[in-house]
C-alpha cells in the first residue's frame, strides 16, 4: 500500500493498470512493476522518491538514457517503466509501452530544439553540469558538493555483486557523472581491497597521464595574472592538484573537463580489468544448438561490454555477429526478419526456438490453434477433384514418374540422397511430423517460456485433452486453455505419459482400447467392420508397408469428446489414434512448468563430476535395484541416460528393518566431496521447551520429501549411477536423478530452503498460527478452537499439495500425545519418548555408544543423568564389535541412571511473560547438572555438563564453562539469557576473576548455598616471599632413549638430581617442581624455565588426569605460601644455568649426536644445506657445516663450494625462463622458496628493473643473485639496485648449480602451469595461478609450511631475533642497586640478568638473587667509577 499511496493516486493507478506491456499483448502494468523499479533505482543510488512526480521521472530518464546502448535488459526494462510512469503523471493518453517511448522521444526532440534556440539567442555555449558534485550557489559561485555516502555504498555493492564483470563499466559511468578527480579517487579508494585490479588501474592511469604530458607540453615562461596553470597528467589524476584547482579547470571558460578526462582513463583501466576477469572474445560467443536465444543474447552483450572498441564497432558487431553466430534455427528466423530488426523483435521471434523441445512445441502450437483438421491433415480423399502433377524422383522433372524415366539412374537413395541403399530400403521415415507451415497458420507463434525458466516437473509430464463440454476442472489446464483461446477457458482430462497413453474409444457402436499417438498422421484400427464405402490404401509403418481399408467421415468418441474423420482399418498390432483426430478434440502434448523453482548447483571450482566404478552386486540385489529403479523411472524421479554421460556413482541395496523389502542406497561420498558447499539454512533442531503453550496442535509429515523437489537440470548428469548385470551379460542400465537424491549433501539445504519459500505465503496469511519446520516434520500450533484449527490444517495441506508436497494421513497426528522430533508432546507438558535401557551381560563398543546416546537424549528432562564413567570405557581406537567389561564406577553410574529413568518426568512450555532461571549443582568428578525453569519445580528443561577442555582444570573454570554453555543454549531456544543461581561465593569468584577476567565472562548471577560449594584450594603469591628458600628447577630427557633427569639448586646451596625412565622433557620439568615442593618448607619460591609447567600451575587446577600434576596439586594445598616465577633458558642466569648443567649431564649432550646419523643419511639423499639440517635434526651449526664439508658432491676443488646456497632472509634469485614463445621472469626467495613471477614483453633491462622495483616494494630485498644475462647486467638494473639499496651478485658462468634454487623453481613452475593451463586463456593468467598454487597450496619443507607461510615466518622471526638481541645487549648496559629484606641501606651495583614483570634477576659478585621490582633501582652504566654507595641518588637515569 505504501507504493500505491506515494507514487500514484487512485485515478492514476487505474490509468496505470490499463496500459499494456507490449502492443497487442495481454499483460498489463501492475503495482509490482513500480515496486521493482524503485528497488532497481536504489541499486543505482538514485532516489526512488523521484518516481512520485513527472519531473522526477524526467530526471531519472535523463540519467538512464546514456547507458541504454551498452546497458543490460534490466536497464532497458527500467527505462521503459519510468517512461510509462512519466506519461501517467503527465496525463498523456497511451495504450502500451511503445506509445510511451514515442511520446518521450517527441518531447525530447521538442526540448532539444528549444534548448538549441535558447543557446543561439544567448550565445552562451558553455554548459555547466547540473549533476553533482559541482553546483552553482545563490551568489553564482561554483561550489563543490562532496560525493554522497549513498553513491559510494552503491559503488561498493556493484563491485561486490558484479566482481568486475562488464556491467561494472556502465554502472561506474552512471555513478560518477560530473565527478571531480578527488571524488573519483574516493570511489577507487573505497574498493582498494581489490589490490590486483587496483594495481592494473594504477598502471593504466600512469600510462595515460604520461601520454597527456607528452601531448600537452608545459608552455615556457610565467603564467599571466588571473590565468590558471594548465593541468599535468598527475593533476588530472588528482595527486598533485587541489580540489579548488580541479573546480577551476572544470568551470573555466573554456573549461578543461579534468573529471571527464580522468573518468575516461579509469574506464580504460576498467576495460582491461574486465578483460582479465572475463577473458572471452566476442568472436567466441556462439549460440549452442540447444541454448535459448535469450541466454545467447545475454552472453553476447555481456562480452560485448567487455570489448575494447568504439561504439561504432560495437554497433557493427551487434548487427552482424549476433545473427552470424546464432544457431541454424534462430539464424533462419533472424534473416527472415531483415537487417533493420530491433533486438525486441528478434527476442520475440526466437522465443522458444532451439533445442529438442522446439519441434514438439511447434506441433503442439499447430494442434492447439487449428480448428479445421482438413486444412492440415491432408487425406487423399479430401482432394479427390484436385489434380496434382507427379514429379520424377530420378531427374526431378514433372509429368512422369521414376519408373518411366529415360534419363540414366541417379546414384544412391532417391529419398535421402545417401549412397549404399535404394529408396525402398530407406530407414528415414517421412511421417511429415513437422511441417514448418503448421505452426504459423494463424499468424505469429505463441510465446513459449525460455528453457531456463521451464523445469520439467517429474510428476507432471502429461497429455491433455480439452473441449468445451467437460465438467472436470484442472487449474493448470484452465490457465493453459485460456492462453490458447483468449476468451473461453477449457477443462482438461490429463493422461500421464509415464505409461503408454491407452484410452477407451467408441466407434461403430463398439468399445475398443486405443493408443493416443501424437507421432502418427493417421488413425489405424485393427480389423473390424465399419459402415459405408471404403477404398484400398497402402501405409508405411515401423514394420514395413501394410494394406488397409480407408473409411471417410466416421464418427468416433474419444474420452467423451466426439470427432469425425478418416479411419484406416487393417492388421495393426495396436489401435492408434493419430493426429487427424487428436487435433479435432484439442489434444496437446504438455510439459507443464514445475511450480518449485530449481536451485542452481555447481561443483567446486576446478573439479569434475565423480567417476567411481560400480562394484559387483549379487543377483538378488540387482533384481531389487531394477525393480526399484523401474518404479522410480515411472514416477519421474530418475531418467535413463546413454553412454555420453561419463560420470558414475556406486549403487547398492540393503534390506529394510524387519522387512523382506529392499532399499536402494547410492554412495554419494565422492560427489559430496566435489559439490559446492551449502549454507545450512537450519543450524539445529527446534526444542519443545521453547514452544509456547497452544490450545490446538497438529503434527504433519511430508511424504517423499526430497523426491518432491526438482534437481538443477545442469547438475543432474553428475548423479549418474549404473545397475550392473550378472556376469556382464549386458551393459549396465544407466540412470540419473531428476529430483533431490537421498544422501547427497545439497538435499537438506535445498529442501529446507524450498519448504520455507512454500510456507512463507501461508505464514503471512495466518500470522497467529505457529509452524515449526524441521526437514519433513511440521508442528502446527494455534489458539483457535479445534474445528477452526483443523480447517486451517486442511488449507495448509492443500497449499502444500498444490506445490507437489503430500502429507500422508497415516502420519497426520490430530490428537495428543503428539510424537515429534523424538519428543512426546501433551497439551500442557512435554517429555522425551519412552527410553528403555537394555539389560546385557556383555557390552560391545557399539552398545555403549548407543547407551550414551540414549542417556544424553534423556538428560534434557531427567535431572542428574551422568555418563562420564561410561564414556571413559570408549577411550582409544576400538572396533565397534569389541566387547568392553564395565568398570565398577561405570556399573554404579548405569544403575543410578536406571533409577532416575524409572519415574517419568515431564517439562512445561515456555511463558514469554516470565523470567528464565537456571540452577546449577556440582555432582563431583567434573560433572555438573542444571535445571532451567520459570516457576519452582516446573522445569522447562534440564541438562548436564561434563566437558573438560583441558587435562588440568578446577571447579571455578568448569563452572564458568557450564554457565557459558547454558547461556548459549538459552539464546538459541528462547532468544534471551536466564538468571543464574550458582554454588559459589562472591569472594571466591572475585579472586578467580581478577586473574582470569579476560578469558571468561558470565552473565548476571547470585549465590545459592547448595552443597558442595565451589572453592579455590590454594593460591599463588604475586611477589617473591621474603626469607623463603628459592629453588631453581629444571629437567631434561632424551627423545630416543626416554631417559631423563630432574633436579633443583637452591639459594642456600642445596641441590638434588633424580634419574627418570620412560619420560619426556615436559614430565621432567613437572617432576623437578614436585621435588622442590616435597623438599621445601611451608613457604617457597620456585624459579622454572618451562612455560609448559608454569601454564599448568598458574591456572590453579584442583584436579587433573595426570597423576604427576595431581601429586603437585596435593603438595600445593599443603603449603602456606608459594611463589612461582619463570626465567628464559640458556641466558646465563646463575641458578638456572647451574641446575641446567646439573640435569643435562649425560642427557642433553647426546641429543644432537643421535641426530648426526639421520642428518648424514638425509644429506646423502637430498644434499640439503647446513641450515636445513640444523633445523630438522637439532644439530649445532658447526656439526651441520661439517657434514656438508665432508660430502664429495658438495665439494669443488677440494673445499666447500663457493656456490653453497646462502639462506639469509633478504636473498632472492632471479632468472628468465621461456614457455610458449613468451618470457617469464621468476624471482625466488631462497630461504623460503616463495615465488614472484610475471610474463614480460621483452627480455630487456628496462622490464627487469621495473619487475625488480615491484619486488622490492613488496618484500625486504637485500641481495639479488642472477646469471650473467644481458638484461641482468644492464645499467638500468644496476641503477634500480643502487636506488633500492640492493646488492647484486652474479652466478658462476656455465655452472647452473650457482642458480640452483631458481632453476629448480622454473621447472616446478612450468609443471604447475601445465596442470592449470587449460583453465586459463592467456599464459599470463596461468602463470599467476601457478604462482598462487606454489606459494599457498603446496606445503612441505622446513616447518611443514607453504612457501607463503614460510616467508612471513622467516621475516617475522628475523625481526624478533634482532629486537631480542638489542634487548639483551641493552640489558647488559644497566646496573642495579637494591635493598635486602628490611635493611635500609642500598647495595650494589649488581649486574642485571633479567627483568620480569614483578621481579628482576641480578648477580651480585657470585650470588644470583631474585629481587622484587619495588626494591630495586636500575640505572644505565656510563662507564664511570662511582664514588660510593651513598652517591647513588635519584639524579641518575632510572628505568
Curated annotation (Swiss-Prot):
Reactions catalysed: Specific for a P1 residue that is hydrophobic, and P1' variable, but often Pro; Endohydrolysis of RNA in RNA/DNA hybrids. Three different cleavage modes: 1. sequence-specific internal cleavage of RNA. Human immunodeficiency virus type 1 and Moloney murine leukemia virus enzymes prefer to cleave the RNA strand one nucleotide away from the RNA-DNA junction. 2. RNA 5'-end directed cleavage 13-19 nucleotides from the RNA end. 3. DNA 3'-end directed cleavage 15-20 nucleotides away from the primer terminus; 3'-end directed exonucleolytic cleavage of viral RNA-DNA hybrid; DNA(n) + a 2'-deoxyribonucleoside 5'-triphosphate = DNA(n+1) + diphosphate
Annotated positions of the Phosphotyrosine modification: 132
Annotated region (Interaction with membrane phosphatidylinositol 4,5-bisphosphate and RNA), positions in chain: 14-33
Binding site for Mg(2+) 3: 1215, 1267, 1303
Chain spans, region Interaction with Gp41: 7-31
DNA-binding feature ranges: 1374-1421
Sequence motif: Nuclear export signal, positions: 16-22
Domain Peptidase A2: 512-581
Gene Ontology terms: biological process: DNA integration; DNA recombination; establishment of integrated proviral latency; proteolysis; symbiont entry into host cell; symbiont-mediated activation of host apoptosis; symbiont-mediated suppression of host gene expression; viral genome integration into host DNA
The protein's required cofactors: Mg(2+)
Region annotated Interaction with host AP3D1, chain positions: 12-19
Region annotation (Interaction with host CALM1) ranges: 8-43
Region (RT 'primer grip'): 818-826
Region (Dimerization of protease): 493-497, 541-547, 580-592
Site note Cleavage, residues: 132-133, 363-364, 377-378, 432-433, 440-441, 492-493, 591-592, 1031-1032, 1151-1152
Keywords on record: Activation of host caspases by virus, AIDS, Aspartyl protease, Capsid protein, DNA integration, DNA recombination, DNA-binding, DNA-directed DNA polymerase, Endonuclease, Eukaryotic host gene expression shutoff by virus, Eukaryotic host translation shutoff by virus, Host cell membrane, Host cytoplasm, Host endosome, Host gene expression shutoff by virus, Host membrane, Host nucleus, Host-virus interaction, Hydrolase, Lipid-binding, Lipoprotein, Magnesium, Membrane, Metal-binding, Modulation of host cell apoptosis by virus, Multifunctional enzyme, Myristate, Nuclease, Nucleotidyltransferase, Phosphoprotein, Protease, Repeat, RNA-binding, RNA-directed DNA polymerase, Transferase, Viral genome integration, Viral nucleoprotein, Viral penetration into host nucleus, Viral release from host cell, Virion, Virion maturation, Virus entry into host cell, Zinc, Zinc-finger
Residue numbers marked as site, Cis/trans isomerization of proline peptide bond: 221-222
ZnF endpoints (CCHC-type): 390-407, 411-428
Motif Nuclear localization signal positions after renumbering to this chain: 26-32
The RNase H type-1 domain, residue ranges: 1025-1148
Residues at the site labelled Essential for RT p66/p51 heterodimerization: 992, 1005
Catalytic residues in the record: 517
Motif (Tryptophan repeat motif): 989-1005
Note: HIV-1 lineages are divided in three main groups, M (for Major), O (for Outlier), and N (for New, or Non-M, Non-O). The vast majority of strains found worldwide belong to the group M. Group O seems to be endemic to and largely confined to Cameroon and neighboring countries in West Central Africa, where these viruses represent a small minority of HIV-1 strains. The group N is represented by a limited number of isolates from Cameroonian persons. The group M is further subdivided in 9 clades or subtypes (A to D, F to H, J and K). Resistance to inhibitors associated with mutations are observed both in viral protease and in reverse transcriptase. Most of the time, single mutations confer only a modest reduction in drug susceptibility. Combination of several mutations is usually required to develop a high-level drug resistance. These mutations are predominantly found in clade B viruses and not in other genotypes. They are listed in the clade B representative isolate HXB2 (AC P04585).
Name of the protein this chain belongs to: Gag-Pol polyprotein
Organism in which the protein naturally occurs: Human immunodeficiency virus type 1 group M subtype B (isolate JRCSF)
Amino acid at each position: 500500500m505504501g507504493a500505491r499511496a506515494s507514487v500514484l493516486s487512485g485515478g492514476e493507478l487505474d490509468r496505470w493498470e490499463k496500459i499494456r506491456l507490449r502492443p497487442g499483448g495481454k499483460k498489463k502494468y501492475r503495482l509490482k512493476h513500480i515496486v521493482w523499479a524503485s528497488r532497481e533505482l536504489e541499486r543505482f543510488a538514485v532516489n526512488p522518491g523521484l518516481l512520485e512526480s513527472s519531473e522526477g521521472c524526467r530526471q531519472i530518464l535523463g540519467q538512464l538514457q546514456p547507458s541504454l546502448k551498452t546497458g543490460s535488459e534490466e536497464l532497458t526494462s527500467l527505462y521503459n517503466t519510468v517512461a510509462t510512469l512519466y506519461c501517467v503523471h503527465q496525463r498523456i493518453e497511451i495504450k502500451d509501452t511503445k506509445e510511451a517511448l514515442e511520446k518521450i522521444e517527441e518531447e525530447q526532440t521538442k526540448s532539444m530544439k528549444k534548448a538549441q534556440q535558447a543557446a543561439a539567442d544567448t550565445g552562451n555555449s558553455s554548459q555547466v553540469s547540473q549533476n553533482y558534485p559541482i553546483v552553482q550557489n545563490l551568489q553564482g559561485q561554483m561550489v563543490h558538493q562532496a560525493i554522497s555516502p549513498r553513491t559510494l555504498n552503491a559503488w561498493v555493492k556493484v563491485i561486490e555483486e558484479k566482481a568486475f564483470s562488464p556491467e561494472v563499466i556502465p554502472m561506474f559511468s552512471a555513478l560518477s557523472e560530473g565527478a571531480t578527480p578527488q571524488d573519483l579517487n574516493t570511489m577507487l579508494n573505497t574498493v582498494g581491497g581489490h589490490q590486483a585490479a587496483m594495481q592494473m588501474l594504477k598502471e593504466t592511469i600512469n600510462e595515460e597521464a604520461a601520454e597527456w604530458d607528452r601531448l600537452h607540453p608545459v608552455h615556457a615562461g610565467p603564467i599571466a595574472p588571473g590565468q590558471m596553470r594548465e593541468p599535468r597528467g598527475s593533476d588530472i589524476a588528482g595527486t598533485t592538484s587541489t580540489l579548488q584547482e580541479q573546480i577551476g579547470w572544470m568551470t573555466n571558460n573554456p573549461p578543461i573537463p579534468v573529471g571527464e578526462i580522468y573518468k575516461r582513463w579509469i574506464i580504460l583501466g576498467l576495460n582491461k580489468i574486465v578483460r582479465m576477469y572475463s577473458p572471452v572474445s566476442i568472436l567466441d560467443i556462439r549460440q549452442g544448438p540447444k541454448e535459448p536465444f535469450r541466454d545467447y543474447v545475454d552472453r553476447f552483450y555481456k562480452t560485448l561490454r567487455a570489448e575494447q572498441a568504439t561504439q561504432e564497432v560495437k554497433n557493427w558487431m551487434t548487427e552482424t555477429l549476433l545473427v552470424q553466430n546464432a544457431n541454424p534455427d534462430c539464424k533462419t528466423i533472424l534473416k527472415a526478419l531483415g537487417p533493420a530488426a530491433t533486438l525486441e523483435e528478434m527476442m520475440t521471434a526466437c522465443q522458444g526456438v532451439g533445442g529438442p523441445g522446439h519441434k514438439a512445441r511447434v506441433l503442439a502450437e499447430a494442434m492447439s490453434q487449428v480448428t479445421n483438421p482438413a486444412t492440415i491433415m491432408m487425406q487423399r480423399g479430401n482432394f479427390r477433384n484436385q489434380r496434382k502433377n507427379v514429379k520424377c524422383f530420378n531427374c526431378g522433372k514433372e509429368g512422369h514418374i521414376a519408373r518411366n524415366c529415360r534419363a540414366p539412374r541417379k546414384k544412391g537413395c532417391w529419398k535421402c540422397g545417401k549412397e549404399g541403399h535404394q529408396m525402398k530400403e530407406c530407414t528415414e521415415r517421412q511421417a511429415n511430423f513437422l511441417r514448418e507451415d503448421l505452426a504459423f497458420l494463424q499468424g505469429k507463434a505463441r510465446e513459449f517460456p525460455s528453457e531456463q525458466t521451464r523445469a520439467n516437473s517429474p510428476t507432471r509430464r502429461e497429455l491433455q485433452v480439452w473441449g468445451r463440454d467437460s465438467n472436470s476442472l484442472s487449474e493448470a489446464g484452465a490457465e493453459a486453455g485460456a492462453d490458447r483461446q483468449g476468451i473461453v477457458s477449457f477443462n482438461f482430462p490429463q493422461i500421464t505419459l509415464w505409461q503408454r497413453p491407452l484410452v477407451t474409444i467408441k466407434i461403430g457402436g463398439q468399445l475398443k482400447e486405443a493408443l493416443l499417438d501424437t507421432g502418427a498422421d493417421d488413425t489405424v484400427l485393427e480389423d473390424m467392420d465399419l459402415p459405408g464405402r471404403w477404398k484400398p490404401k497402402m501405409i508405411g509403418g515401423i514394420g514395413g508397408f501394410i494394406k488397409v481399408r480407408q473409411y471417410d467421415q466416421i464418427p468416433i468418441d474419444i474420452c467423451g469428446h466426439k470427432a469425425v474423420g478418416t479411419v484406416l482399418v487393417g492388421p495393426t498390432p495396436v489401435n492408434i489414434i493419430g493426429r487427424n483426430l487428436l487435433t479435432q478434440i484439442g489434444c496437446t502434448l504438455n510439459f507443464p512448468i514445475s511450480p518449485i523453482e530449481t536451485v542452481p548447483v555447481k561443483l567446486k571450482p576446478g573439479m569434475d563430476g565423480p567417476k567411481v566404478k560400480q562394484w559387483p552386486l549379487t543377483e538378488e540385489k540387482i533384481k531389487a535395484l531394477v525393480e526399484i529403479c523401474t518404479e522410480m523411472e515411472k514416477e519421474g524421479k530418475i531418467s535413463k541416460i546413454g553412454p555420453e554421460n561419463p560420470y558414475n556413482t556406486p549403487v547398492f541395496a540393503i534390506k529394510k528393518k524387519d522387512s523382506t523389502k529392499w532399499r536402494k542406497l547410492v554412495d554419494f561420498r565422492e560427489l559430496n566431496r566435489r559439490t559446492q558447499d551449502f549454507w545450512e539454512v537450519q543450524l539445529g533442531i527446534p526444542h519443545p521447551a521453547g514452544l509456547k503453550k497452544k490450545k490446538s496442535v497438529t503434527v504433519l509429515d511430508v511424504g517423499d520429501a526430497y523426491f518432491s523437489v526438482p534437481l538443477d537440470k545442469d547438475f543432474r548428469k553428475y548423479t549418474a549411477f549404473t545397475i550392473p548385470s550378472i556376469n556382464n551379460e549386458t551393459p549396465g542400465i544407466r540412470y540419473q536423478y531428476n529430483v533431490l537424491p537421498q544422501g547427497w549433501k545439497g538435499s537438506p539445504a535445498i529442501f529446507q530452503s524450498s519448504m520455507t519459500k512454500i510456507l512463507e505465503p501461508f505464514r503471512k496469511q495466518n500470522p497467529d498460527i505457529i509452524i515449526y519446520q524441521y526437514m519433513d516434520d511440521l508442528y502446527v500450533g494455534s489458539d483457535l478452537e479445534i474445528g477452526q484449527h483443523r480447517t486451517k490444517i486442511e488449507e495448509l495441506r492443500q497449499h502444500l499439495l498444490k506445490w507437489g508436497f503430500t502429507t500422508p494421513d497415516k502420519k497426520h497426528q490430530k490428537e495428543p500425545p503428539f510424537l515429534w522430533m523424538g519428543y512426546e508432546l501433551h497439551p500442557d507438558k512435554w517429555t522425551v519418548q519412552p527410553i528403555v535401557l537394555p539389560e546385557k551381560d556383555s557390552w560391545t563398543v557399539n552398545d555403549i555408544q548407543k547407551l550414551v546416546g540414549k542417556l544424553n537424549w534423556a538428560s534434557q528432562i531427567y535431572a542428574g543423568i551422568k555418563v562420564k564413567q561410561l564414556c571413559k570405557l570408549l577411550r582409544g581406537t576400538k572396533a565397534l564389535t569389541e566387547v568392553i567389561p564395565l568398570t565398577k564406577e561405570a556399573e554404579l553410574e548405569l544403575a543410578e541412571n536406571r533409577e532416575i529413568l524409572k519415574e517419568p518426568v515431564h517439562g512445561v512450555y515456555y511463558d514469554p511473560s516470565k523470567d528464565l532461571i537456571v540452577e546449577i549443582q556440582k555432582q563431583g568428578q567434573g560433572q555438573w547438572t542444571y535445571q532451567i525453569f520459570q516457576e519452582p519445580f516446573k522445569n522447562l528443561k534440564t541438562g548436564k555438563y561434563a566437558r573438560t577442555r583441558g587435562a588440568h582444570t578446577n571447579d571455578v573454570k568448569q563452572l564458568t564453562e557450564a554457565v557459558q554453555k547454558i547461556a548459549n543454549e538459552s539464546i538459541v531456544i528462547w532468544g534471551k539469557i536466564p538468571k543464574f543461581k550458582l554454588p559459589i561465593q562472591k569472594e571466591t569468584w572475585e579472586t578467580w576473576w581478577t586473574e582470569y577476567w579476560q578469558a571468561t565472562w558470565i552473565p548476571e548471577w547470585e549465590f545459592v548455598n547448595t552443597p558442595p560449594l565451589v572453592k579455590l584450594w590454594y593460591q599463588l603469591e604475586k611477589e617473591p616471599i621474603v626469607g623463603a628458600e628459592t629453588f631453581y628447577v629444571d629437567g631434561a630427557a632424551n627423545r630416543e632413549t626416554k631417559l631423563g633427569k630432574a633436579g633443583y639448586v637452591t639459594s642456600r646451596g642445596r641441590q638434588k638430581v633424580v634419574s627418570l625412565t620412560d619420560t619426556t622433557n615436559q614430565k621432567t620439568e613437572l617432576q623437578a617442581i614436585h621435588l622442590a615442593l616435597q623438599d621445601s618448607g611451608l613457604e617457597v619460591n620456585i624459579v622454572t624455565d618451562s612455560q609448559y609447567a608454569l601454564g599448568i600451575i598458574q591456572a590453579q587446577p584442583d584436579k587433573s588426569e595426570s597423576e604427576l600434576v595431581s601429586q603437585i596439586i596435593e603438595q600445593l594445598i599443603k603449603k602456606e605460601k608459594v611463589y612461582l616465577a619463570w626465567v628464559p633458558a640458556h641466558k646465563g642466569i646463575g641458578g638456572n644455568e647451574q641446575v641446567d648443567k646439573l640435569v643435562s649431564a649425560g642427557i642433553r649432550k647426546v641429543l644432537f649426536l643421535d641426530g648426526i646419523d639421520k642428518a648424514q643419511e638425509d644429506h646423502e639423499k637430498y644434499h640439503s644445506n647446513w641450515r636445513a639440517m640444523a633445523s630438522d635434526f637439532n644439530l649445532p651449526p658447526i656439526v651441520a657445516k661439517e657434514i656438508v664439508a665432508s660430502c664429495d658432491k658438495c665439494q669443488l676443488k677440494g673445499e666447500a663450494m663457493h656456490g653453497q646456497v646462502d639462506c639469509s632472509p633478504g636473498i632472492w634469485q632471479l632468472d628468465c625462463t621461456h614457455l610458449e614463445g613468451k618470457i617469464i621472469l621468476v624471482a625466488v626467495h631462497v630461504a623460503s622458496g616463495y615465488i614472484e613471477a610475471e610474463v614480460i614483453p621483452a627480455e630487456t633491462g628496462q622490464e627487469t628493473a621495473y619487475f625488480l622495483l615491484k619486488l622490492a616494494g613488496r618484500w625486504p630485498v637485500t641481495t639479488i643473485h642472477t646469471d650473467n644475462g644481458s638484461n641482468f647486467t644492464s645499467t638500468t638494473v644496476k641503477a634500480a639496485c643502487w636506488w633500492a639499496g640492493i646488492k647484486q651478485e652474479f652466478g658462476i658462468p656455465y655452472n647452473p648449480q650457482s642458480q640452483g634454487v631458481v632453476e629448480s623453481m622454473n621447472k616446478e613452475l612450468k609443471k604447475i602451469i601445465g596442470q592449470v593451463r587449460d583453465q586459463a586463456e592467456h599464459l599470463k593468467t596461468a602463470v599467476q595461478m601457478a604462482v598462487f598454487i606454489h606459494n599457498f597450496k603446496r606445503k612441505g619443507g622446513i616447518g611443514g609450511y607453504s612457501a607463503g607461510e614460510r616467508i612471513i615466518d622467516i621475516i617475522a622471526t628475523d625481526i624478533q631475533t634482532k629486537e631480542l638481541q638489542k634487548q639483551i645487549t641493552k640489558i647488559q648496559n644497566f646496573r642495579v642497586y637494591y635493598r635486602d629484606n628490611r635493611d635500609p641501606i642500598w647495595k650494589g651495583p649488581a649486574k642485571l640478568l633479567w627483568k620480569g614483570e614483578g621481579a628482576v634477576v641480578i648477580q651480585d659478585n657470585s650470588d644470583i638473587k631474585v629481587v622484587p621490582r619495588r626494591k630495586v633501582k636500575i640505572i644505565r652504566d656510563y662507564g664511570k667509577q662511582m664514588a660510593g654507595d651513598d652517591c647513588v641518588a635519584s639524579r641518575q637515569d632510572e628505568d
